[in-house]
Amino acid sequence: MANITNEFMGHDMLAPFTAGWQSDMEPLVIEKSEGSYVYDINGKKYLDTLSGLWCATLGGSETRLVEAANKQLNTLPFYHSFWNRTTKPSLDLAKELLNMFTANKMAKVFFTNSGSEANDTQVKLVWYYNNALGRPQKKKIIARAKAYHGSTYISAGLSGLPPMHQKFDLPPPFVLHTECPHYWAYHLPGETEEEFSTRLANNLESLILKEGPETVAAFIAEPVLGAAGVILPPATYFDKVQTILRKYDILFIADEVVCGFGRLGTMFGGDKYNIKPDLVSVAKALSSGYMPIAAVLVSQKISSVILSESNKIGAFCHGFTYSGHPVACAVALEALKIYKERNITEVVNKISQKFQEGLKAFADSPIIGEIRGTGLALSTEFVDNKSPNDPFPYEWAVGTYFGAQCAKYGMLVSSTGDHVNMAPPFMLSLEELDELIRIYGKALKDTEKRVEELKSQKK
């Protein structure tokens, strides 16, 4: 097939998370998907090791999801959920989500279209809740450095990634950031994981006391930081954090957008770390990425106050045209059925051991500082001298080069700076996993050679 991507150079999209110079290059245009693979418009086949953007957990050709969408489109393609009007798929999905989440008793579900909107909604819920309780000063939200919570105004402010703040006048003044719990990168010499967790918890408490506990409303955290590079919490971290939050009556918002529905080998990421949140955000795997949908799970403690207050003032005035879209809800319901029928956490745990061990076998590479992960999520961090304090020069673009070599050999990864994320579909076969490990090794060998060349030029 002739190469036809040139016709899309200088295309008309203002693309997300894309620099201007990239718009003058040929874009990678994906045309179709099949299982764990995607194909570009020239017919080249790629193993998709990021499940699109952490979401296509059931791969790209799950006919049951397509059939669920078609059936709903032929029955009721759209109706809204405003003014106590709704649809059966949205009611059924809300009930199913409440039944599935067992770490804490949740009472209500609010539907949005993306994880960003879900986390934006969380902040408005928290504010509404505290206003209803007569605590208008209790509005600040504590997030963490390196976290990713979305790209709307509030969710981008919550995110602890400077490029998401620069030129956007972010973060807003009501958002505070505490430290990233990355033990490998930030522990002191001789400090154990538990001691590191204690130090971070003490610093969190100091921040709360400095701001005034009466002004701090909530703390938001991903069980495992995803986009930041699959950063796992150190031992006892969340136990200590939750003790402090309870002490000062601060709500816990669990951002399960990446971790939820089996990614870490548990149905929700918080199950792995004994997290008992007041509010939960879910998205991505909720529909396996087949339809845009997200949800906020609200505890009885919060929903009862919100509903009571709305009776006094006339309404809870927040929502989106497509909240609880019937087609998206029908697809999500079918995805959740598949997860249950196939015992998806068992599937993930079965294949994840080989996934983690197969890739961590490359950890001795002189250009790798750390390979970290759990379940079907893994990140490789490239550094010099195997030290977090010795990053490669920015212009060397080591992670980007590795990602380009993976693509050359037929595999797509996420390269952000000098860390590379992988989160493959749950239905990845053992043969596909062998292919993943083989291509990773080839791309790593190329990258090691490239770094040696750059070092020799620098001398």
From Swiss-Prot:
> Which NCBIfam families does the entry link to?
PRK06105.1
Give yes or no: UniProt keyword Transferase. yes
Q: What does this protein do?
A: Involved in the biosynthesis of capsaicinoids natural products, pungent alkaloids synthesized from phenylpropanoid intermediates in the placental tissue of chili pepper fruit acting as repellant on herbivorous mammals and conferring spiciness to hot peppers. Can transfer an amine from vanillylamine to pyruvate forming vanillin and L-alanine. Can use pyruvate or oxaloacetate, but not 2-oxoglutarate as amino group acceptors. Is able to convert (S)-1-phenylethylamine into acetophenone in vitro.
GO biological process per UniProt? alkaloid biosynthetic process; biotin biosynthetic process; gamma-aminobutyric acid metabolic process; phenylpropanoid biosynthetic process
Q: Which organism is it from?
A: Capsicum chinense
Consequence of gene disruption: Low pungency phenotype, characterized by low levels of capsaicinoids, and accumulation of high levels of capsinoids, which are non-pungent capsaicinoid analogs.
Query: What domain of life?
Result: Eukaryota
Task: Keyword check for Coiled coil, yes or no.
Answer: yes
Instruction: State one molecular function term (GO).
Output: adenosylmethionine-8-amino-7-oxononanoate transaminase activity
Q: In the UniProt record, what gene is named as encoding this protein? A: VAMT
For the modification N6-(pyridoxal phosphate)lysine, the affected residues are 284
Q: Mind telling me what this protein is named?
A: Vanillin aminotransferase
- Binding residues for pyridoxal 5'-phosphate, per the UniProt record? 115-116, 255, 320-321
Segments forming a coiled coil: 428-459
What EC number(s) has UniProt assigned to this enzyme? Answer: 2.6.1.119
